[in-house]
Each structure stands twice: as structure tokens, then as C-alpha cells.
Amino acid sequence: MWPYPKVFAHRGGGILAPENTLAGVRCGLEYGFHAVEFDVMLSKDGVPVLMHDPEFGRTVKGQGSVAATLFSDLQAMDAGGWHSARFAGEAVPSYAAVVNFCRQNHIFMNVEIKPAPGFEEATGRIVAETTLALLADVSVTDEQHLPLFSSFSFAALMAAKHAAPAIPRGVLMDSVGDDWKARLQEAGARALHTNHRHLNDAQVAQIKDAGYGVFCYTVNDTERAHEILRWGVDAFCTDRIDLIPADF
């Protein structure tokens, strides 16, 4: 059901580094994390890049949106200065650059497909096609070296399924709705990814009994982490890579 690591560094390095950057992934690696979660969306010219927010202002200074900005211009923007002076000038990375870094350092990837509004199907398809090209030398049966896709956008996840059916998928839901099983079946999903705050032990048992894995976001308290693992949750991501170790 869940052949992957148990603890993932959220958006690269959690709170210790700017999210969705190579510096963040390096930070997670420095803390011993060989499993990372990050977000991917498309630039104006269709290049998959790491970014959570479709609009600038929080992690990238300025006005505008990722979907309206060329990749070359995104690379010139500061994606690290918001975090601390140490990371000022950190670039918005391409998905390809991060995949290559993760492969070189044996880091497992949970790739959250995060489409800007109106680009759901295109984002799912292009991220999947890009992944296939980057991992052309990896066997489709080699689960440890294939990423795990996930998305809140069912349209994006289905587009990824059609473009790259061999790459495993997880359905993201903020809470476990009545249609969770139908959604996972339609997506051909490996797991359900959900907010630990809206989850209970009975739901975990139901999902696991149906043959699916359970992944939670974003767990930053050790007592809560122990609790959900006792319930049978398979894995979770954390911002507190300084408190919750990779071998928790």
C-alpha cells in the first residue's frame, strides 16, 4: 500500500529555508531528509516551475502571476529574500532542475501538481510529460525512483494519469468526503492525502481497509505525529524538520 518514506520535508526545507526552492531541498537534505514534497505550476511559456502561490507577493516580491510570466523572467526574481537575508536572490527553480537534484541525491519526491486557475489539464499533462522525459531511464516498476503525484485539482490529476499512467498518484482532499473512494478509484490512486486536522482514526481504518495509503499534511507537533501514526497513517510532511527527524 505505501512503499515510500514515512516523513517528508514540506516544500523542501520546511520553516528553515524558502519554500519550493533548491535551497529548501538542500536544507532538507542537510537535515537527513531523503523525501520531499513540493508544488509545481506552469510559467507563461509552459515550463513547470516550483511555486505554491499563483500570484506574486508572498514568496516572490512584486505584482503579477506565474501564469503570466515567462520562465526566464521568473528565474530573475527573488524567491528567497522573503525568508531571510541569507537566502536573498534564490531563484525560482525549474521542475527539471529539482528533479535532477533529487535524483542525484537519492531524494524521493511527492510532486503536488498545483495549477493556476484555468490551467488544470495543461498543468497535469505537462508535468507528467516532463516527468516521463526526465525519468526515461527509470523502469515503470521501480516505485522507489518514480515520484508520487498528488493534487487538489482532480482535472489536473486525471490529465497526469492519461499522460503518464505508470506514475503513482494520490488524491488530495482537505477533508475526507463521502466520495473519497470513488475519487481514488477513478484516479487509479495509490493513496489519499489529507489534512491531519480533519482526520480521525475511524476514517484511517476505513481507507486502509480499502487498500489505500494515507498521507497527512502538515504535522509539526511530535505528539500529534505519534498519534496519527498509531492510527495507521502511513506518512506525513512537516515544516519542523528541526523537531521531527526523517527517521521519526
Predicted regions and their residues:
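Phosphate-group recognition and catalysis centered on beta-loop-alpha active-site segments
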Residues: 1-248
